[in-house]
């Protein structure tokens, strides 16, 4: 009987102590239109910020019908 009572009290404590934390940790709602605009903005910025990168120095891997 004591084990069940301790278990029940512990369970209730954990449930009610976690509720405010869940509410605070919940991410704010962002409408799909806002996210789409941010994505377009990010895409435009990435077009502007292209960086020139040289070719790779890695060799070819041996493959079926490839360069040995």
UniProtKB/Swiss-Prot annotation:
Keyword Metal-binding assigned: no
UniProt signal peptide: 1-25
Short sequence motif named SxS motif essential for MIK2 binding, residue ranges: 56-58
Chief location: membrane
Compartment list: Cell membrane; Secreted, Extracellular space, Apoplast
Keywords from the UniProt entry: Apoplast, Cell membrane, Cleavage on pair of basic residues, Membrane, Secreted, Signal
GO cellular component: apoplast; plasma membrane
GO molecular function, one term: LRR domain binding
Complex and partners: Interacts with MIK2 (via extracellular leucine-rich repeat domain); this interaction triggers the formation of complex between MIK2 and the BAK1/SERK3 and SERK4 coreceptors, and subsequent BAK1 activation by phosphorylation.
Family: Belongs to the serine rich endogenous peptide (SCOOP) phytocytokine family.
Role description: Brassicaceae-specific phytocytokine (plant endogenous peptide released into the apoplast) perceived by MIK2 in a BAK1/SERK3 and SERK4 coreceptors-dependent manner, that modulates various physiological and antimicrobial processes including growth prevention and reactive oxygen species (ROS) response regulation.
Name the record gives this protein: Serine rich endogenous peptide 22
Species per Swiss-Prot/TrEMBL record: Arabidopsis thaliana (Mouse-ear cress)
